Each structure stands twice: as C-alpha cells, then as structure tokens.
Amino acid sequence: MSKTFNVNGICYPNEHYMVNIDSKLAQIKQLVDEKKYFVINRARQYGKTTTLNMLVKYLADKYTVFFISFEGLGETAFESETAFCGTICELLYDTVLYEEVPTIDDTVKQIIIDSIKKKAQDMLSLSSLISNICKNAEVPVILMIDEVDQASDHKVFIDFLGMLRSKFLKRSTRPTFQSVILAGVYDIKNLKHRIREDHEHQMNSPWNIAADFSVDMSFTRDDIASMLDEYEKDYKCTMEDCGIDL
C-alpha cells in the first residue's frame, strides 16, 4: 500500500509520510532513564499521541511500557473511586489482550489478567497492584496515559495522582513505575486548580514531583524537508514539479 500524508489522528510509519522524530524520542528516553515523571502538554495536532505510540517501541528494548488513554471514557469511569480503579485495571488488561506491550514477561501478564477477575476497589488496592506488577517485572515499568484532559473535572483523578506521588516518594523501598508520562492539552496543575479551590491545595499539587518537559515538539524546515524527500523518491518528482516552494 502506498504511503499517504495524514493530518487526522495517529500516524504510522508504514502507512504515512512522517517527519523523523528520533531525536525527540531520544530526549524523552533520557527523562525516562533518569526516572522522571512528567507531562507532555501541547495543543492538538502537535503529534503527542503519535510520539507516545512510537515511544512504546523505542523504549521496548529496555522497559515494559503500558500505554493507555482516557479518550472515550464516559462519566461512569470517574463517578467513584471503585469505578475509576476498575477502569484502570481494564485499560491495563486491554494492552495485554491486544498485545500492545512489546516487552512483558509471563508473570506480569498473569498478574494483570488476574486483576480483571478481581478488580481493585480503591486506591490502596490499585497501589498494591502497581507494586506487584513492578516487583515482578524483569525490567523497569513505564506508564503512559494519553488524553488526561478527559479526567480534568474529576477529583478521583487527582486522588490517583496523589497515590502515584506517594509511591514516587517511597520508591527507594517500594516497587513502582520507573517513569510516568501524562499527555494532554493542558498543564496538569491547571487541571487541579479547576477542582480544588482551597489555596493550600492549589499550591500543593499532587503532581509537583513532575520534571519540566522542555523537548521541542515542533518541526523545523529541515525536519519537514526530510519527509518530503521520501515522497519525492516514491513518486520520482520534486516539490518544484508539484508547484511547492520550500
């Protein structure tokens, strides 16, 4: 199948003409290697989801990567702690069911399969599940969550961040994720402000453990030119032939 240009949704290297983002992936991997928790917040059509999708494979030789998304979740997923924790279990299970985790050992796979039979009922049990996964994994575990804006108006999501923060602070003695990457349009601190009105809570965000994300997600002229070069080779033409001035 011939490749096409895609401006709607996720891009796949075998289907679409794409800018080479290896340098960006390498910079993000550096943050992961340093055990950073961080947020990628950029406007839509900035390639966040495509980048995360490619990051799964980029990290696979060294990490077990779970990539889930809150996109499409209804209000019932956030209406209670029990519902939210059960949803996280289901999202993790789906990544295993559809073989979306390139590097995962059988023990961890079975832990996640078992978790769907008896879903976590609260943050404490979800925390225990996370520790169990990370303790038994043969390589460090990464969690990536896309479309976190879907959870922006729900307190239970802030509680979830608080649980992850608690585990982050105790990670020298208790197994947890090597890195957590959240992606969305808005900064996670702004999401928190929309829920908590108390000044003390506003200044004490559960995500104040996050490192600054300074990777430039935009594309340079040279980046775009490399993508068009591939098109020229495929169609044996030049941009000038097409009336495009670079």
List each language-model region with its residue ranges:
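Short, basic/glycine-rich phosphate-binding loops at helix/coil junctions
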Residues: T4-I10, T103-K109, W207
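A short, basic N-terminal segment
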Residues: M1-K36, I188
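The catalytic "switch" region of P-loop NTPases
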Residues: G9-I10, K155-L246
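Generic hydrophobic alpha-helical segments
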Residues: K24-I28, L126-I130, L164, L228, ...
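P-loop NTPase nucleotide-binding core
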Residues: Q30, E34-Y46, T50-I158, Q178, ...
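A conditional alpha-helix N-cap/helix-loop micro-motif detector
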Residues: M18-I21, D122-M123, M239
